[in-house]
Amino acid sequence: MSNPKSNPRTWRRLPALAQVCLITFIAFPVATGAADLIPAPGTKLAPATNDIVITAADVTVEKLGTNIPVSAIGEPVGGVTLSPPRWSDATPNSVAYATVDGAIAPKDPKGKPINFRVMLPASWSRHAIQMGGGGMNGTVPMMRGERAGSLTASFATYGSDSGHQMGGFGGFGFPGGGGARGGGGGGDDWALNEEAIRNLGYMQMKKTHDAAMVITERVYGERPRFNYYIGTSQGGREALTVAQRYPADYDGIVANVPILNFSTLMLAPELIRIQEKPLSNWVTRAKANAIRGEFMRQADKLDGLEDGVINNYMAARALFDMSEGDPNRNPWAALRAPDGVDTNSSDTSANARLSDGQIETLKMVYSRYKFATPLANGVKTFGMWLPNTDPTGSGLIVDQRFRGQEGAGPSAPMHSQLGILGVTGFLMQNVSANPLDYVEGGALNARREEISKWLDSTDPDLSAFYKRGGKMIVTIGTDDTLSSPGSQLDYFQSVLDKMGRDTVDTFARFFVIPQVGHGLSGRSYGTAGDGKTVPTFAIPNQYDRTALITAWVERNEAPGKTLVVTAGGHSLPLCSYPNYPRYKSGPPEQASSYESAAP
């Protein structure tokens, strides 16, 4: 995936980009095994040896049928219809395969259908992968060329548009302004429909899974021996959702940069703009160099090496998170303007100064946000963001004033971001509302609690998934300004608190790559914490998640809690939360010069 740091709006393309990542993950031959529930965690399974082979004659309307009974679907539906299957012969770039499209009708006559697709390779290894979506979904993820990876590996693949249709992709990233308030050609009305919202949150995954299982059995004569969910961003949230809600359906989960606290993540850019209603609180892009320089000055050295990389993310977070520690401290004191008044708003240098109001805004962005009342699963805060090298990324900082803010006239635009429907539609139930009218703990509080139950994948109790033998690998980046690394870290901790470290280590890996963004890529910063100019390099980030998860699930080969990742000529330990790579001695570009250390 392209680096969001270079262009925050690139996240609009997430479905296609996420699929590219998925192709990379799944284009590997793997072993197969048993279909039933794994008797106990760690049980080795005997592999199946022969693929099931089909031809076009095996995938016909007569054999497949035109519908699926509603009783076969584990969430309420109005019906399931199937389109005539299509056969594609092998080409130099693809194996032969069949495509089955279908539509799952809503129970609510005003609702939207779930469009889904199942792709069935001619030679099937008894594996299946449900592919996660991206952004706010609205398109079937398998409509863009991913078959070269999954089908070549003899996996059946399937996915859906999650129950609403968008003519163009619309995600929930945080551009600072502009763009259609709905962000898609399918209309905004779906955001006012309860069934459509709940489909997006969780039901579409189960409905699509159950339909795909019926189709797979009708075509091959049996269901998959191993079923995986692989997703990035929204798809990563979906992957964790199915582990939390439908654990019996999946053997392995790969979740990349999951948007766990989805309901608040959509609201977060509005919370920042609300904080910036007074002109004196408005942080502009001119301050970016000073902000990232201050992060580096205080946090670069915390990993034992000043090289333009903040590896010790937990200690760095603790410096700037005002929700913990001394509430009277000021981590931004070094940048405070004389008398707390910014007299040079156009200063773009690393020496730019901040007003007291701007400092309060930065404290808010880099501290846990406390809710008026707990949301789903008892979550009391939203983790917000960590010290990073991309403080303007994804609209965290904008150079525009919006209706409802001081200095914005009556004709000023209302603030818009790609997930605005999650605020005006899901929450405010008025797509024409001004999102800056939101008040924490106000009249919308009960609605906040309700949609949180539908959308947030924050249940720390993964015991059902663990007991059925499921395995998961979750990877996040601390420079991610599209997701919230703070909320991801807080979720990791909640799972450890609930289940215990020893148990978690038997079935899950929570990997953290310091200083990479939403695409799990990033670079070192050219000015180290001591102010010296240093060469920049790509942050090591490359490792094969799918090979790891299949080996763990199917051969009981657990990945290490510390791996080695590479990029270019550099390598670095990849550590499990909360550990980080601490420099010991030796060449800084070699992983052997570091150790996995607790914060």
Task: Please report, for each region that a protein language model flagged, where it lies by residue.
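Alpha/beta-hydrolase fold nucleophile elbow
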Residues: 222-232
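Cap/lid segment of the alpha/beta-hydrolase catalytic domain
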Residues: 135-221, 267, 432-454, 516-536
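Catalytic-loop region of hydrolases
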Residues: 35-127, 140-145, 181, 309-310, ...
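Short beta-strand/loop motif that positions the catalytic acidic residue
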Residues: 474-476
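Gly/Ala-rich beta-loop-alpha elbow adjacent to hydrolase catalytic centers
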Residues: 231-235, 239
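A catalytic-pocket lid/entrance helix-loop region that shapes and gates access to the active site
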Residues: 241-243, 248-370, 526-543
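Short beta-strand element of the alpha/beta-hydrolase
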Residues: 126-135
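Gram-negative bacterial Sec-dependent N-terminal signal peptides
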Residues: 7-32
